[in-house]
Amino acid sequence: MKSIGLNLSGREYKILIGSDLLSETATLLREAIPCDRVVVITNIDINRIYGKKLKKHLESKGIESLFLELPEGEIHKTLDMAAHIYPQLINHFAERNTPILALGGGVIGDLSGFVAATYQRGVPLIHLPTSLLSQVDSSIGGKVAVNHGGVKNIVGSFYQPRLVIADTGCLKTLPEKEFACGMAEIIKSAAIGSSELFRMLETNTQAVKDRSPEVMEDIISQTAAIKAGIVCQDETDRGIRNILNFGHTLGHALESTSSFSQSHGAAVAIGMCFAARLSVRLGLCENETALRLEKLIADFGLPTNPKDIDPDKIIEAMHHDKKVSDGRIRFILLKRPGEALIAENILKPDVLSVLEEMK
């Protein structure tokens, strides 16, 4: 098991990464929060695979558990779904010291975190991420949010978990499409923060695709450490943390304009290719860098170009993004593998030109 610590203005928590950690949940949980009762928020598919085993494990250690099973999908990450959860917490007599365990992927983590942050002004949050994307990205850093009015993550806050338990054994049951989505975030982290990880992904593509336990634990740990290091410098996303949004400006617009039928990982993959091409157009990086990134993305079965887009609608969606400041769309652009920069004064014709090239 590997452990990564985050220290945020005196508030500390750990990200634990290893195989079969779900079977140690009770012990690891009690090391962070003394408790004898928890609420587990999950979805139908994850509950079917892990719910019964986790519930039995918790009960064997004297921890009473209420499992709340939600429908699957980004479309359900809403205020209405949060409002559906609150009465169940009240009826269960959940108190301010009753932990909420988020068992699932990014949608469950975001929604559970939003509920934990707002129920009784905040209850302990524990992430049990089961998807690759959530293990390397969404469970780390404290962003919690729901979608509203067709805009992704527009209602939310920063609310740090007390513990993250990333069981790499969960990746064995992860569908190929979901695995690829997680790889998009790993590639993103390598592109902005580690040329060594970028090269490792290029030279060990097949071992990663085969989900070699040793390789996966290594790259998950490296990716988590990159994000943790950035979050510790800028918890509330006012400065350097913005570089974690590489690929997300276009990515979120693609998700929103598709009514969230476009997966997050695929959208971010396309967004990274767009950002790299825009970087080349602006003379910020070599064309070879963009080509290497596109090849790596394609090698993991992710798309590099959008389908059936209306560039004007994409631009409009970008203006609704949280990253807009003083009416200016903020882009994260690439200089070379492992180094990115924040850019705001990008001209609309340049954006439209690259979008047209990618159609």
From Swiss-Prot:
Per its Swiss-Prot or TrEMBL entry, what cofactor is needed?
Co(2+); Zn(2+); NAD(+)
PANTHER family, alphabetized = 3-DEHYDROQUINATE SYNTHASE, 3-DEHYDROQUINATE SYNTHASE, CHLOROPLASTIC
Q: Which cysteines are joined by disulfide bonds?
A: none
Q: Where are the transmembrane segments?
A: none
Which Gene Ontology terms of cellular component type are present?
cytoplasm
Q: What is this protein called?
A: 3-dehydroquinate synthase
Q: Which reaction does it catalyse?
A: 7-phospho-2-dehydro-3-deoxy-D-arabino-heptonate = 3-dehydroquinate + phosphate
Q: Which residues of this UniProt protein bind Zn(2+)?
A: E185, H248, H264
Task: Report keywords, A-Z.
Answer: Amino-acid biosynthesis, Aromatic amino acid biosynthesis, Cobalt, Cytoplasm, Lyase, Metal-binding, NAD, Nucleotide-binding, Zinc
Q: Does the record carry NAD as a key word?
A: yes
Pathway of action: Metabolic intermediate biosynthesis; chorismate biosynthesis; chorismate from D-erythrose 4-phosphate and phosphoenolpyruvate: step 2/7
- At the top of the EC hierarchy, this enzyme's class is lyase
Entry keyword Nucleotide-binding: yes
Xref: CDD domains: DHQS (cd08195)
Q: Which sites bind NAD(+)?
A: 72-77, 106-110, 130-131, 143, 152, 170-173
Q: What is its EC number?
A: 4.2.3.4
List GO molecular-function terms, semicolon-separated.
3-dehydroquinate synthase activity; metal ion binding; nucleotide binding
Q: Which GO terms describe its biological process?
A: amino acid biosynthetic process; aromatic amino acid family biosynthetic process; chorismate biosynthetic process
Q: How is the cofactor bound?
A: Binds 1 divalent metal cation per subunit. Can use either Co(2+) or Zn(2+).
State what this protein does: Catalyzes the conversion of 3-deoxy-D-arabino-heptulosonate 7-phosphate (DAHP) to dehydroquinate (DHQ).
Give one Pfam hit by family name: DHQS_C
Q: Which family does it belong to?
A: Belongs to the sugar phosphate cyclases superfamily. Dehydroquinate synthase family.
The listed locations are: Cytoplasm
